[in-house]
């Protein structure tokens, strides 16, 4: 291992952080090409799946190369031996999270099932669309931003700053408000950062992020960070904004913030697999 974290001169560390953020922001944009093409000219599902897998694989491959550039001989947070266990554990956490959140909103009178509409092709495409999103955003915000801040300034600073950046980058989304960005900062930014720190891999937050979006939109029928999707359930969402999140989606609800904060605290009070590192 070469110079990393607080061993680097500050200017070199800052250059790597800014360059990494800009480079992977562009890479994240390019990784969305299959989604953009499909919106204009629908692609057969099997082609879409392969394009999504290739796109996600390319992002992970480029991240591995970047880890060599910023001082590592390999990317320990992409350890293949942990892929299956952490990715699918994360997927389960995201699914349970949104099932519980939807139940809470329903109990508060803000959600009920209007109808159910099964569309296999739409569900499959949505599943792989949100895989691309989960991989790209976790590599950018946890693999680049959180990790480099953590190595330099420690976990608390990394968690706060990366979460704020993650939350407020969504301010440009449809129907976004300052509150929706604060909500994402707390419920998702903190949770995903805690999952990354606890597990020591990107696979766990990728799995959470992937299923979080998939169950939020294509399954339960909420807007995903302000963006409407085709969904299995066509819900009737009504009630005060603090209960439902309004047009931005359930992420902007108070129950989501409370539940996300609870899961974050649970991660930090559960013995960490990276107990030898700063927390």
Regions found by a protein language model. Name each.
Residues 14-18, 49-50, 87-92, 123-124, ...:
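Hydrophobic alpha-helical transmembrane segments
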Residues 29, 181-241:
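Functionally important transmembrane alpha-helices
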Residues 30-49, 70-139, 146-151:
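Juxtamembrane helix-loop-helix connectors linking adjacent transmembrane helices
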């Amino acid at each position: 291992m070469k110079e990393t974290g607080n061993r680097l001169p500050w200017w070199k560390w800052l250059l790597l952080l800014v360059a990494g953020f800009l480079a992977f922001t562009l890479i994240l944009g390019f990784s969305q090409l299959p989604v953009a093409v499909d919106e204009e000219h629908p692609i057969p599902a099997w082609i879409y799946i392969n394009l999504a897998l290739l796109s996600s694989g390319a992002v992970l491959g480029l991240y591995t190369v970047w880890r060599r550039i910023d001082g590592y001989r390999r990317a320990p947070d992409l350890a293949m031996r942990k892929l299956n266990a952490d990715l699918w554990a994360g997927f389960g956490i995201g699914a349970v999270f949104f099932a519980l959140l939807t139940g809470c909103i329903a109990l508060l009178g803000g959600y009920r099932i209007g109808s159910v509409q099964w569309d296999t092709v739409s569900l499959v495409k949505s599943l792989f669309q949100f895989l691309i999103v989960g991989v790209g955003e976790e590599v950018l915000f946890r693999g680049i931003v959180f990790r480099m801040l953590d190595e330099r300034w420690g976990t608390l600073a990394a968690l706060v700053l990366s979460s704020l950046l993650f939350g407020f980058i969504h301010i440009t989304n449809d129907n976004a408000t300052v509150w929706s960005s604060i909500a994402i900062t707390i419920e998702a930014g903190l949770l995903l950062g805690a999952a990354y720190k606890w597990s020591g891999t990107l696979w766990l937050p990728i799995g959470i992020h992937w299923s979080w979006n998939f169950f939020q939109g294509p399954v339960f029928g909420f807007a995903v960070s302000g963006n409407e999707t085709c969904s299995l359930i066509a819900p009737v969402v009504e009630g005060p904004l603090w209960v439902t999140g309004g047009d931005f989606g359930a992420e902007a609800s108070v129950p989501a913030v409370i539940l996300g904060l609870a899961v974050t605290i649970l991660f930090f009070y559960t013995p960490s697999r990276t107990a030898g590192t700063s927390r």
